[in-house]
Design a protein with these regions (language model features):
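Surface-exposed loop/turn motifs at beta-strand-loop junctions within extracellular Ig-like
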Residues: 19-21, 89, 145-149
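Beta-strand-rich binding/interaction modules
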Residues: 67-111, 119
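Beta-strand-rich ligand-recognition modules
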Residues: 1-14, 18-32, 104-108, 112-131, ...
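Accessory beta-strand-rich segments of carbohydrate-active enzymes
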Residues: 1-55, 78-80, 158-160
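N-terminal carbohydrate-binding accessory modules
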Residues: 56-57, 142-168
């Protein structure tokens, strides 16, 4: 990733990319036997607001009795403001139809926290529905980031599942 902000001017800008055939990572670029030159993978250009999340760690955990769970979040942000965190139960994913049981979802919880730097959130989820390959039950975690003036800056959504794996 590269920060381009200092090089941008108002109006139209031109982005030029120089591609080298051989790099330190040549072995990695050649592992699939692609012998092409140029850019052969996706390239993205993102505009990121001053107040935004730049690192998100999501840990859905299930209790030993498999009836309840805990959702732990570690969020790292730039700028100051607040974040609204919402967990929505989407239901079982119907793979044949590529849709959820309840497309609109059912809110499990929502909370709003002040945000500046690092934020740790831990929230219990009662009557948690477990995810498995046979029953792909998903939740949607939605994080809305607001700046200090209360204006929405970005929305980050992630599908998550609660499961427990152990060997006894």
């Amino acid at each position: 990733e590269f920060e381009l902000t200092p090089y941008l001017k108002d109006g139209e800008n031109k982005l030029a990319v120089q591609v080298f055939k051989w790099t330190i990572g040549s072995w990695c670029e050649d592992q699939d036997f692609f012998r092409f030159s140029g850019i052969f993978r996706s390239v993205y250009l993102y505009m990121i607001p001053k107040t935004h999340l730049y690192d998100i760690k999501i840990r859905p955990q299930v209790a030993e009795n498999l009836s309840c769970g805990t959702l732990e979040l570690d969020l790292r942000s730039c700028g100051s403001g607040s974040v609204r965190i919402q967990l929505v139960e989407r239901g079982r994913l119907d793979l044949a139809e590529s849709r959820y049981e309840t497309p609109e979802g059912t809110e499990v919880f929502a909370l709003e926290e002040k945000m500046e730097g690092t934020l740790h959130v831990s929230r219990e989820v009662a009557d948690v529905k477990l995810w498995s390959a046979e029953e792909p039950y998903l939740y949607e975690l939605r994080m809305e980031v607001y700046d200090a003036a209360g204006k929405m800056q970005e929305v980050v959504a992630s599908k998550i599942g609660f499961r427990r794996f152990e060997m006894k």
